C-alpha cells in the first residue's frame, strides 16, 4: 500500500498543534474553549458542521454507549464531541507519536481514559487481528484519500466492525472550485491527496462490498474557505485568513437560506461522506 503522505509529515503537523496548544488556551487541546465551540450555538457556525451534527449524525447515531473508534484520530476533538453529544465510548488509532500525545491530552482534559488512544499503525496485521469485529462504529475523516489504493483501506475499516456496526468515512472534496483554490494557496496539499475518489460516483465504488449496506452517501456543505491550507508567512496565508473571516457571514447566510436542506454540489461542497452498516 502506497501512502501519499508519510509519518514525518504527520509528526511535524501534530508537533505544531501540540506546541501551540500548550501556549494558547484557545487552541485545539482545549476544545471547550475553542473558537469553533464558541460559534457552535450561533448562525456563524460552519455550515457543513451544522449539517453533519444537526442533520446527518442524529439520524444514524441514535444509540448510546456504543464503542466508536476513529482511524487517524489525532487530535481527538471529534471523538470528544461524539462522546459528549451522543454518549459514545471513544477510542482512537493513531500512528504519529506527537498525534497520540495530543489525542491523549484532549481525552484527559475531557474525562476520557487516555489508554483508549491506541498508538499503532492501522495497516498492521497486529491491529487487524487484535481488534477484528471489536467496534460498534468505525470512522475516519480525511484518511483514506492519503492512499493510492483506498478500496483496500476501506476493507481494513470494515474488518474492525461488529456485524450490525456502522461505518462512517468522510473525505475532503478538492475538486472543482476547491481544487483551484487549494492549488493557489499550497499545491503540496493537492499532491498528498488522491483526487480520483473525490467524485461521488468514484467514492461510492469504494464501498461496493457484500458486507456493507449503504445508509447515506453524498456531498455535504457548500462553499467553505476553512477547507484550505496555506504555508505560514506567505501572501496566500494572510489572504486565506481574510477569506476565513469572510466565511462567517457566509455561514449565517447559508443557514438562513438553506436551513437543513443543504446545497450540495460537486463544484463547491467541501466534503463527501459515506455511512453504511455491516451486514
Language-model-detected regions and their locations in the chain:
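Conserved N-terminal segment of class I S-adenosyl-L-methionine
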Residues: 1-133, 137, 141, 154, ...
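Short, glycine-/aromatic-enriched active-site segment of Class I SAM-dependent methyltransferases
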Residues: 170-196
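A C-terminal cap/extension of S-adenosyl-L-methionine-dependent methyltransferases
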Residues: 182-183, 216-279
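Short conserved AdoMet
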Residues: 83, 148, 162, 208
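A short glycine-rich, Lys/Arg-flanked "PGG" loop and its adjoining helix->strand segment in the class I
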Residues: 151-163
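A short His-aromatic
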Residues: 142-146
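Short alpha-helix
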Residues: 195-211
